[in-house]
């Protein structure tokens, strides 16, 4: 490379094949064509800082690939600053290809690898009130990341070498750029140096460090601009900041995964960081002993699952009385009947044979069979033909229905000794160690009482659910037999009446509940009307605050005139809103939402 007193910077400032997301960044082709060629050079600044001009843009060119910019950096103070930065920056000194060392060029590629064009906002008219006309292009800036894609900057001390990296640029335009550069060098005198605002430059560099997915976006811009690999671009570099040491094994290189990159307030081209920090705000810390106590209480109070009873043939009426008197042989030996007083016989009953012998019907006394005035309503089998029926399993309660029998409590289980880190290791001085334990224990007790109440209500509902609210007689199965003492067509018996125990007195919360109407009656129409007035889920979901559908567009004022400019630098636009953090929920409310939802869904369902 031929050494030169200035550094050239070229690149696309707008690519039609990669349109930007923001409407204000779109450039009208007719407007751009009317503004070219430039009547005078445009200022070249750093990060759109008006008090940091470092050179001039001597031409903007419309090519088939997009709007192309060519500029030169002539500020002596800025070039000296680049030399100092290079010696202290490890990323600037890293190279993937064996290229000649260029401290200024390599420092620029590591610090300001993108171009940004500042143009007039499309909503602002170009004609002023006094009849003047505003220039559409205001200035071009070198920045850390542009808001338009494909705006990668290529620096170099040789203009021909810089233009060679853009394969989408027409040779005719490249030749025109070289001619304009020579003419601008002859016309321009000694460049004026302005003192650099170092504080602002450092602030912009800090903002650029929090751009989300900056390295990945720079790689994308490089691909859109179609720039080959033999350049000083740092977008694909992964610098090894550790000195090589053969004696010690070097650790693995730092990850460049976009998910691990930081983000910050860098304008519309980036989003603020902190997405992963909100993941732990919904968690609470519970001591291990408290958690194990809650888990044990849950297991102790959980009712056992009721296994379905094996299928058996239907039993004749009052067969349990015959099974109780069965001899010591046969399937019914040893069966125990329930306590008496559960059934009353208004007429007669048929007890059936005792041992399963068909001839036992003839040997039975006459009083063992009592005719009934009505014929049997159904036919279920022949008692005694296949032997006595299987024994009736024992029942609990005042009706023929199995109830839940809670398992014995594990009160004799050895309690774990409290650990030091659980009792006082995670607490600050003066903090009560039983604060969370009392809240959780009280909540667990309330949940257990509610579950027992719901189970009692469910058992009562299932007990009387087949006959409505009233205690109507329960009709049992009827049987016939064709033996000498069997039922004849003109004979019948009356169904035994079921006399249950009186129901328990209703509690306060049970009495307040409305009883369902008995079968055969029509529910009042007011219930249907009330259901029709229930709001839908979609309406309830939309009851929250609505977002503003017409947000005000941000405006950016020009640095030396009252124009509204559009700056295409991602790090030059600060976010107007800070990420809102959700309010922390109280401990009791959060615990209530966890345990109520988990325990009630598993037990009551």
From Swiss-Prot:
The record marks 235-236, 568-569 as: Cleavage. Residues 568-579 have a biased composition (Polar residues). The active site is at 48 (charge relay system), 116 (charge relay system), 139 (charge relay system). GO terms for cellular component: host cell cytoplasm; host cell nucleus. Pfam families: Peptidase_S21 (PF00716). Keywords: Host cytoplasm, Host nucleus, Hydrolase, Phosphoprotein, Protease, Serine protease, Viral capsid assembly, Viral release from host cell. One of its GO terms (biological process) is viral release from host cell. Its EC number is 3.4.21.97. Residues 235-274, 403-431, 489-588 are annotated as: Disordered. The keyword Protease applies. InterPro entries: Herpes_virus_sf (IPR035443), Peptidase_S21 (IPR001847). It comes from the Viruses. It is an enzyme of class 3 (hydrolase). A motif (Nuclear localization signal) lies at residues 410-416. Residues 281-300 are annotated as: Interaction with pAP. Residues 585-605 are annotated as: Interaction with major capsid protein. One of its GO terms (molecular function) is serine-type endopeptidase activity. Region of interaction between pPR and pAP is called Amino conserved domain (ACD). The region of interaction with major capsid protein is called carboxyl conserved domain (CCD). Belongs to the herpesviridae capsid scaffolding protein family. This is Capsid scaffolding protein. It comes from Epstein-Barr virus (strain GD1) (HHV-4).
């Amino acid at each position: 490379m031929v050494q030169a007193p200035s550094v050239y910077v070229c690149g696309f400032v707008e690519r039609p094949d990669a349109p930007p997301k923001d409407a204000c960044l779109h450039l009208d082709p007719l407007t751009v064509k009317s503004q070219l060629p430039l009547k005078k050079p445009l200022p070249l600044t750093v990060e759109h800082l008006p008090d940091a001009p470092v050179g001039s843009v001597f031409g903007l060119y419309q090519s088939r690939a997009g709007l192309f910019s060519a500029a030169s950096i002539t500020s002596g103070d800025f070039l000296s600053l680049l030399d100092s930065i290079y010696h202290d920056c490890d990323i600037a000194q890293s190279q993937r290809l064996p290229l000649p060392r260029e401290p200024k060029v390599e420092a620029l590629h590591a610090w300001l690898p993108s171009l940004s064009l500042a143009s007039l906002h499309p909503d602002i008219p170009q004609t002023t009130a006094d009849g003047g006309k505003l220039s559409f292009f205001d200035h071009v800036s070198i920045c850390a990341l542009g808001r338009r894609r494909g705006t990668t900057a290529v620096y170099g001390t040789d203009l021909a070498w810089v233009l060679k990296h853009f394969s989408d640029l027409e040779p005719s335009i490249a030749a025109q750029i070289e001619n304009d550069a020579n003419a601008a060098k002859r016309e321009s005198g000694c460049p004026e140096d302005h003192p650099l605002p170092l504080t602002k430059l450092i602030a912009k560099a800090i903002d650029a460090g929090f751009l989300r997915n900056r390295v990945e976006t720079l790689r994308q811009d490089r691909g859109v601009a179609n720039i080959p690999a033999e350049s000083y671009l740092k977008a694909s570099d992964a610098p090894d900041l550790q000195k090589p040491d053969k004696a010690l094994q070097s650790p693995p290189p730092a990850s460049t995964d976009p998910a691990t990159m930081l983000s910050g307030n860098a304008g519309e081209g980036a989003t603020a960081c902190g997405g992963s920090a909100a993941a732990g705000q919904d968690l609470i810390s519970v001591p291990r002993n408290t958690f194990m106590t809650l888990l044990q209480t849950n297991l102790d109070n959980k009712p056992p699952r009721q296994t379905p009873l094996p299928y058996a043939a239907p039993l004749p009426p009052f067969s349990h009385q015959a099974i109780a008197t069965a001899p010591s042989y046969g399937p019914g030996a040893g069966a125990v009947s329930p306590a008496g007083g559960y059934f009353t016989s208004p007429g007669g009953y048929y007890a059936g044979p005792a041992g399963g012998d068909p001839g036992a019907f003839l040997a039975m006394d006459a009083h063992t069979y009592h005719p009934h005035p009505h014929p049997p309503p159904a036919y279920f089998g022949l008692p005694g033909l296949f032997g006595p029926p299987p024994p009736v399993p024992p029942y609990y309660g005042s009706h023929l229905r199995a109830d839940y029998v809670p398992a014995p409590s594990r009160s004799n289980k050895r309690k774990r000794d409290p650990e030091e880190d659980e009792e006082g290791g995670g607490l600050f001085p003066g903090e009560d160690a039983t604060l969370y334990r009392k809240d959780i224990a009280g909540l667990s007790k309330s949940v257990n009482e509610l579950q027992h109440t719901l189970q009692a209500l469910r058992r009562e509902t299932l007990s009387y659910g087949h006959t409505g609210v009233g205690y109507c007689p329960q009709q049992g199965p009827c049987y016939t037999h064709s033996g000498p003492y069997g039922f004849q067509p003109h004979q019948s018996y009356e169904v035994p009446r079921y006399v249950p125990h009186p129901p328990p007195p209703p509690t306060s919360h049970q009495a307040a509940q409305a009883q369902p109407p008995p079968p055969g009656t029509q529910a009042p129409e007011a219930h249907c009307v009330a259901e029709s007035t229930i709001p839908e889920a979609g309406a309830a979901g939309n009851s929250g605050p609505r977002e503003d559908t017409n947000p005000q567009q941000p405006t950016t004022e020009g640095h030396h005139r009252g124009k509204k400019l559009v700056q295409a630098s991602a790090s030059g636009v600060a976010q107007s809103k800070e990420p809102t953090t959700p309010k922390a929920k109280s401990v009791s409310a959060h615990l209530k939402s966890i345990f109520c939802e988990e325990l009630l869904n598993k037990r009551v369902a």
